[in-house]
């Protein structure tokens, strides 16, 4: 998102003030993570240790970044703040006023014109989408998501944008089913395996809906999770420890280093169709309760 020179300078001052506030709130280091080759004015900010990350999702997840910068151990506390929220904090101390304005992405296959919008945190969804959702055929529906498709929350059209959401997504509702769909070649269905012939077109774009294409299945070892979780842990064993409620094993397998969003991509590709993010959250909650 391009900013004018004057707006960029103002934003830089807000970020610098936010970093100064963070330094006063912690005896530890303040780390600033940005996308490689798109640092902009970030290297000019003082008081924070700069880190760059490149690659596909989940490279941008804060949990992944913490894992590679300074892994969390038992007894340690790490606080994180989004870059736009850092600017809001800086704006508060620079100007003495609470201004919750931020920029969000409005995206998804059912959006007429994908764009960035300047909104106030918690804005009404219909005020953001107004006239920007593609017309639907009779019987078709859309799902509105506060956040992204992997970790966001379903919200009605008259609902509100989540406080922490920086994206509003609209995709087709998967409420249509196929008879014996599993037996069809399905050239237009996405799959990470070679279950469908769509693997012959690796660069093809898909309009994915919310259909899970099946129900929950036995939790089997596939080796898929390790391909989609760039962390030095054993995700399958950690999940099983969470299911068993074995806190000692959870600690040894890295429960302190993860949050549920780190496993979102694993949940998407999981052939067992298990709610992996919920398993991780339940494990974390159990650990906190028993601490």
At which residue positions do the language-model features occur?
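Gly/Ser/Thr/Ala-enriched C-terminal appendages of enzymes
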Residues: 148-291
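Gly/Ser/Thr-rich active-site loops/lids in small-molecule metabolic enzymes
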Residues: 15
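Single conserved hydrophobic/aromatic residue that forms the stacking wall/gate
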Residues: 2-7, 11
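Hydrophobic alpha-helical positions that pack around
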Residues: 25-138, 142-183, 189-192, 196-198
């Amino acid at each position: 998102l391009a900013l004018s020179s004057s707006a960029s300078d103002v934003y830089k001052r807000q970020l610098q003030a936010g970093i100064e506030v963070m330094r006063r709130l912690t005896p530890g280091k303040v780390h600033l993570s940005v996308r490689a080759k798109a640092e902009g004015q970030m290297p000019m900010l003082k008081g924070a240790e700069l880190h760059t990350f490149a690659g596909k999702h989940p490279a941008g997840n804060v949990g992944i970044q913490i894992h590679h910068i300074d892994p969390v151990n038992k007894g340690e506390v790490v606080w994180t703040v989004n870059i736009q929220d850092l600017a809001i904090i800086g704006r508060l101390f620079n100007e003495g006023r609470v201004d919750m304005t931020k920029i969000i992405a409005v995206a998804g296959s059912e959006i007429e014109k994908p764009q960035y919008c300047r909104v106030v945190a918690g804005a009404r969804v219909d005020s953001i989408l107004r006239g920007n959702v593609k017309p639907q055929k009779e019987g078709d529906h859309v799902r509105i998501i506060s956040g992204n498709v992997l970790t966001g929350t379903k919200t009605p059209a008259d609902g509100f944008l989540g406080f922490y959401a920086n994206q509003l997504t609209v995709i087709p509702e998967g409420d249509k089913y196929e008879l014996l769909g599993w037996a069809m070649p399905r050239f237009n269905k996405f799959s990470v395996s070679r279950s469908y012939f769509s693997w012959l077109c690796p660069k093809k774009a898909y309009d994915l809906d919310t259909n899970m294409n099946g129900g929950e299945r036995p939790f089997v070892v596939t080796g898929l999770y390790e391909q989609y979780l760039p962390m030095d842990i054993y995700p399958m064993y950690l999940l099983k420890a969470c299911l068993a409620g074995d806190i000692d094993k959870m600690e040894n397998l890295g429960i302190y280093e993860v949050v549920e969003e780190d496993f979102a991509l694993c949940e998407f590709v999981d052939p067992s169709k298990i709610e992996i993010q919920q398993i991780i959250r339940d494990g974390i909650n159990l650990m906190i309760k028993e601490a």
